């Protein structure tokens, strides 16, 4: 049985207490998991969200992106320290929520491109930071921190599953795994099956389901049947979350270079995408 989820990005750019209505809405639409974006964990309405997800009966998962102010591969040690502090606070939020997974760009500042390939020093800084955060998480709960491989236009640090698995192994705490996103995979991987098998059950921690153009899943170029077959083959049973963005967003759509509408609303995209993906999954 597949655990299909949906991202809060379908409805809002920055989840806050005014967005609590999204939690029952996601459940009503047939999703089992809600992927909640948190960039500022220190101001996140943790208690309110915890109460609402418990009331509704939906599984909470969080994602984040480090920023230029919390970039753990920055040459500035103060910025690296701020990144570790922010990630530890995010761990605290997840533990209180009862979330079992953190996803996203947890290893470097999102969009903080150096203009050259990743360096060994950057690798060392990131691994050291992640090891500290992951050990902190391990001491508190069974929370898994995942590292999302994103395309070359968004990060120079982790673009493919092979590097992400090597990163997880080097961190070495056992609770750091790989977050695969089909939008990024179709740009960077040579094979969906190969990427999934590279991670295997041991290192595959989280999945985002996005069409190649950020449109309605099942209407583009992503080889969904191959992807689902590979996931089934390695025994992945975790959340599989539809992520896209409402066409009315301004800042997020600018950052993600989304210039046209793919559906009347983000919700319409998610609902049709869920229907398409369930039909494909039923054939696997």
Task: State where each predicted segment sits.
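Histidine-acidic metal/acid-base catalytic patches
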Residues: 1-12, 16-27, 47, 98-100, ...
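Residues at the starts of beta-strands that form the adenosine-phosphate
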Residues: 3, 59, 143-144
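Short beta-strands and strand-loop turn motifs
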Residues: 5-8, 34-35, 64, 104-105, ...
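A short, flexible beta-alpha/helix-coil linker loop
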Residues: 11, 68-70, 109-111, 151-152, ...
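Short N-terminal micro-motifs specific to bacterial/archaeal maturation
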Residues: 13, 40, 71-74, 117, ...
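Structural motif corresponding to the early beta-alpha repeats
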Residues: 32, 36-127, 237, 241-251, ...
